[in-house]
């Protein structure tokens, strides 16, 4: 009986060892530890199987342990997908205060792809894979709390080139032709009529680059910024008058324009010459009528005054100045005349009377200072 028990115990001992080994192998299959490694793998088409595989990847970091679990179902068919490398920066929270980051790479799938799956009991479905950001920084790691900071791998930068020529700074001002106080300017003959504002908007910058070449050198020495004054002609719409602040600059400006004549033609300026600003000012019809009317009135007033000054003046009573009232009373200024049949004596008496009147008295000489009217004695008998 004792022999039978020993024999049975001897048979059961190997089975116990076998069961212990199987349990150890099963435990080893479930837990696999690995250090930080960099791998690049490609997922190739797999053959459907009836088992599901669980991969447990453990990264060993001093002071902390992270587990990355990836579940795969072997019954699903996945096509080949290329993978990209993603850098993980992990800073362990070791109490010693060392902040040395640990960097490792984890393969991730490329941008979003749709994978069909097949199964006996599950209908066809779609699985979406999303790629993570190119760079992930993991900081402030602790066993109980972990925070993730996501940053962009590239930063914008500015590129400047010092070899490019700097543009000439200047300005163009538009003014009315009547507001210009200078006498002369340069007429820019345009190929087609255009206002000053339109020309400034379309071709102003190019004109500054051409005409402000000399002024730019002076500006570097401390002078003011180049400024051009343009005025629209009222007589010729296709003419833009360029007015300069100093009339002595006209010859030098004309020489500069002749030097860049080909460039000016590209801007639509056919020709240019020096002209008087007053000739481009138009006068309205009302102004012309007012001037003519004023001239006619002045002529009429002048003629009337001339005739009034040459006319002989008369007294208020209507008598001529210089006539003797007594002479008018006694004879009315009429002389004595004798008829054809008058006698010589009568003519002599008339002459005596006329002589007395011409003396201014018209009276005969009186005695004792008294004047008496002369009595005429008739020669004929009554």
UniProtKB/Swiss-Prot annotation:
The modification Phosphoserine is found at residue 343. Glycans are attached at residues 50, 56, 87, 137, 144-145, 246. Keywords: Cell adhesion, Glycoprotein, Membrane, Phosphoprotein, Signal, Transmembrane, Transmembrane helix. Residues 344-371 have a biased composition (Polar residues). Residues 1-34 form the signal peptide. The modification Phosphotyrosine is found at residues 326, 336. Pfam families: CD34_antigen. Residues 34-60, 92-126, 318-382 are annotated as: Disordered. It is found in: Membrane. It is a single-pass type I membrane protein. Residues 309-382 are cytoplasmic. One of its GO terms (cellular component) is external side of plasma membrane. Highly glycosylated. Phosphorylated on serine residues by PKC. Expressed in the kidney where it is detected in the thin limb of Henle's loop (at protein level). Highly expressed in hematopoietic progenitor cell lines, brain and testis, and moderately in the thymus, spleen, and bone marrow, but not in adult liver. The chain crosses the membrane at residues 288-308. Residues 35-287 are extracellular. One of its GO terms (biological process) is tissue homeostasis. Belongs to the CD34 family. This is Hematopoietic progenitor cell antigen CD34. It comes from Mus musculus.
């Amino acid at each position: 009986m004792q022999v039978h028990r020993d024999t049975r115990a001897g048979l059961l001992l190997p089975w116990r060892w076998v069961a212990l080994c199987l349990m150890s192998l099963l435990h080893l299959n479930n837990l696999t530890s690995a250090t930080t490694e960099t791998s690049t793998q490609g997922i190739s088409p797999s053959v459907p199987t009836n088992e599901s595989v669980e991969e447990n990847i453990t990264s060993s970091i001093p002071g902390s342990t992270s587990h990355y679990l990836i579940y795969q179902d072997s019954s699903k068919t996945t096509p080949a997908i290329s993978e990209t490398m993603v850098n993980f920066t992990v800073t362990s929270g070791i109490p010693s205060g060392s902040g040395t980051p640990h960097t490792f790479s984890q393969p991730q799938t490329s941008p979003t792809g749709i994978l069909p799956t097949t199964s006996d009991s599950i209908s066809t479905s779609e699985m979406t894979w999303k790629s993570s950001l190119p760079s992930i920084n993991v900081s402030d790691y602790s066993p109980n709390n972990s925070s993730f900071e996501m940053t962009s791998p590239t930063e914008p930068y500015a590129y400047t080139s010092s070899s490019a020529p700097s543009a000439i700074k200047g300005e163009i001002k538009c003014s009315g032709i009547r507001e210009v106080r200078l006498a002369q300017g340069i007429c820019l003959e345009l190929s087609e009529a255009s206002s000053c504002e339109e020309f400034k908007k379309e071709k102003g910058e190019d004109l500054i680059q051409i005409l402000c070449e000399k002024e730019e050198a002076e500006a570097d020495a401390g002078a003011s910024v180049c400024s051009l004054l343009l005025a629209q002609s009222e007589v010729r719409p296709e003419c833009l008058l360029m007015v300069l602040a100093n009339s002595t600059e006209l010859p030098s400006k004309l020489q500069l324009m002749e030097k860049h004549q080909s460039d000016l033609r590209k801007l639509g300026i056919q020709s240019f010459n020096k002209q008087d600003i007053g000739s481009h000012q138009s006068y309205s019809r009302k102004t012309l009528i007012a001037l003519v009317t004023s001239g006619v009135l002045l002529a009429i007033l002048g003629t009337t005054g001339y005739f009034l000054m040459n006319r002989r003046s008369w007294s208020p009573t209507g008598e001529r100045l210089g006539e003797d009232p007594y002479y008018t009373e006694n004879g009315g200024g009429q002389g004595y005349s004798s008829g054809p049949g008058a006698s010589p004596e009568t003519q002599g008496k008339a002459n005596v009377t006329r002589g007395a009147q011409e003396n201014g008295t018209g009276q005969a000489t009186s005695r004792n200072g008294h004047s008496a009217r002369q009595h005429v004695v008739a020669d004929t008998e009554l």
